[in-house]
Amino acid sequence: MQQTKKLTQCDVTIAVMSGSFLQRGEPALVSKWYRTKMALAGGIDLVVELPYAFATQKAETFANGAISILNALGVSDICFGSEDGHVQHFYNTLSLQQKKQNTFNQLVQQYISEGNSYAKATSEAFSHILSGHDTIDMSQPNNILGLHYIQAILSQKSTIRAHTIKRFAAHYHDESFTNKHIASATSIRKQLFIGDCSFTSIYPFVPNCTSSLLEEYYHIYHVLHNWETYFPLFKYKLLTMSAKELQHIYEMEEGLEHRILAKIQNATSFLTFMEAIKTKRYTWTRLQRVCTHILTNTTKEEIKSAAIENHAPYIRLLGMSQKGQSYLSKNKKQMSLPLLTHTKTFEHPVLNIERRANAVYLSALQEPLRTKCIQQNITQYPIRYNEIDKTFL
């Protein structure tokens, strides 16, 4: 955050945040409202939601949704973390890919025919055509997402300027604490699910406000969300579905439904299930996203009828500082998308999917908190934060 503000010299900082489920194809650790509080306390002025229909997608669609929202908000600059750290390398990569598009496409098909996943095939194709140039390493996850952010800016003819900050010490997929002061989100989540959910082990790696809000959420709702939380519901759902029904689930490829139905029979946890269905053809993240769509019953037809293309249909405001509120007051009339402060009266196929995904996410809570929170997700107004007094209003 400090580096972003220094790099962009921004007046207002805006975060586009996934809701209940994440791009990796897994539930968020705590609710979007608690994560909004963490963001506001950490220095963000406006927190807006990236809808499920974009948030649980491949990098290209995820980036298109995020950039369309930022563009509608009138953002001048974006900043993302990457393993590379040089924004010009991203533009070089896109330029070379376009010049060698035919070769690139042929290589992708060749690597897929050899049994590689699409992600692995594209990574290998990039490696081949980019060798010897000042370009990015397309085997790194944050580089991949960053490339799609810039691609989205260009394809949407946006005037947004891109910046990137090099990620140091902790890597995206690190599962253990390898540095005394910096840890990956993956390692922090894993640590929280070891033993009796001890929060003290993560204190050196997260801001005080974040650890306090994590503890508060756990003490109120008695859960931190991960896939194992939902495994009983997930297994029940699969045991009551046919292969034909599974074929309609979004991102389900032909033949995968039979493997899923066969392996769920003896699976005793989500981890053992994933290990059983994992093959060279599909990445772990891709399979988790399919599982997320099964859990939320998101179908191919639904996503198609939502007609999301490259643009989000609305902006859901989750939280704002006083500075953020002032920015909205001045710029609201110029925004090219509807700004929602609640979802009581707004209707859209993307929002229908969102409501169902939220309800499924909150099924992990006990009654009466579950029903109360499901209703609050619809009626909740944005969280307001006084950045001077550091208090929520």
Curated annotation (Swiss-Prot):
Q: What's the superkingdom here?
A: Bacteria
Q: Where in the cell is it found?
A: Cytoplasm
What keywords are annotated for this sequence in UniProt? ATP-binding, Cytoplasm, Ligase, Nucleotide-binding, RNA-binding, tRNA processing, tRNA-binding
- Catalytic activity from the UniProt record: cytidine(34) in elongator tRNA(Met) + acetate + ATP = N(4)-acetylcytidine(34) in elongator tRNA(Met) + AMP + diphosphate
Q: Which Gene Ontology molecular function entries are recorded, alphabetically?
A: ATP binding; ligase activity, forming carbon-nitrogen bonds; tRNA binding
Listed InterPro entries = Rossmann-like_a/b/a_fold (IPR014729), tRNA(Met)_cyd_acetate_ligase (IPR008513)
Can you cite a GO biological process for this protein?
Answer: tRNA modification
What does the entry list under GO cellular component? cytoplasm
Record EC number:
6.3.4.-
Q: Which residues hold ATP?
A: 81, 142, 167
- Predominant subcellular localization, coarse grouping: cytoplasm
Q: Which family does it belong to?
A: Belongs to the TmcAL family.
Q: What does this protein do?
A: Catalyzes the formation of N(4)-acetylcytidine (ac(4)C) at the wobble position of elongator tRNA(Met), using acetate and ATP as substrates. First activates an acetate ion to form acetyladenylate (Ac-AMP) and then transfers the acetyl group to tRNA to form ac(4)C34.
Q: What is this protein called?
A: tRNA(Met) cytidine acetate ligase
The organism of origin for this protein: Bacillus cytotoxicus (strain DSM 22905 / CIP 110041 / 391-98 / NVH 391-98)
- Quick one: which gene encodes this? tmcAL
